[in-house]
């Protein structure tokens, strides 16, 4: 299935408008503006939500992005920090949607972010929510004007990677947002999406390194943040709420993560 055939703007304009309203409500309630460019401030926004914590550490599986889970009554979003920073940011916004909608336990892989599999409406809505939150329409139009992009013919790879740097999002996210605001036609969008995004020898990643624009968002940060999960596991041990084998395994893993961070 073609990426555009899974894009909500094309598949269901009514659903698109609904998600737009959800993003606008969240921006007004938690961000303070509907045109603020968040970049990695998305993590601060998540941390400001009272009953939500973020856990971050690297996992040697770049197809595995993150997930939402509940542990002892507390909600956590896990993010794999072996991903490029831009995809960590997108993962955070994607999982935020699931938390806001229904607190659903949800595992996110790279195919879901890239939309390279059959349409899953909830996952597509989460991707759209993330894209609208990270690339607000008014902010995007303002940046297009600053870059003197008035029509599709004005777009160049250099301008695309500048937009990626400004909003700290992956290549496909920028291209799909340009389609959603109707700067690009379906055919033009497909032509842009045919360009390799992650090949370091050609395409977008090559141009990023060549021009040294937005390289910070390509870093695999390997950052470790355990929030209060370790304390919860220890408390569970003291209260005998978890099997001893599981507690030992969990604590061993967290000790290993702590050691890697040091």
Q: How would you name each of these model-derived features?
A:
Residues 1-262:
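Active-site hotspot residues in diverse enzymes, especially metal/ion-binding acidic/histidine motifs
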């Amino acid at each position: 299935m073609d990426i555009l055939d899974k894009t909500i703007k094309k598949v269901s304009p009514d659903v698109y408008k609904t998600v737009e309203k959800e993003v606008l409500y969240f921006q007004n309630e938690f961000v303070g503006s509907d045109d603020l460019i968040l970049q990695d401030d998305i993590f601060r926004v998540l941390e400001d939500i009272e009953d939500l914590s973020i856990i971050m550490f690297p996992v040697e599986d770049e197809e595995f992005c993150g997930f939402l889970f509940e542990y002892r009554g507390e909600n956590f979003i896990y993010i794999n920090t072996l991903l490029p920073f831009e995809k960590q940011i997108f993962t955070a916004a994607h999982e935020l949607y699931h938390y806001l909608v229904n607190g659903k336990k949800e595992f996110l892989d790279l195919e879901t972010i890239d939309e390279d599999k059959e349409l899953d409406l909830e996952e597509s809505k989460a991707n759209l929510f993330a894209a609208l939150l990270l690339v607000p329409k008014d902010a995007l139009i303002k940046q297009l004007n600053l870059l003197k992009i008035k029509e599709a013919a004005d777009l160049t790879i250099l301008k695309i990677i500048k937009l990626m740097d400004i909003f700290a999002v992956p290549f496909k996210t920028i291209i799909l947002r340009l389609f959603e605001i109707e700067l690009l036609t379906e055919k033009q969008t497909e032509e842009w999406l045919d360009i390799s995004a992650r090949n370091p020898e050609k395409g977008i990643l090559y141009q990023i390194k060549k021009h040294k624009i937005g390289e910070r968002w390509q870093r695999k940060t390997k950052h470790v943040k355990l929030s209060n999960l370790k304390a919860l596991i220890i408390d569970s041990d003291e209260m005998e709420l978890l099997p001893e084998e599981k507690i030992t395994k969990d604590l061993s893993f967290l000790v290993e993560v702590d050691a890697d961070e040091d």
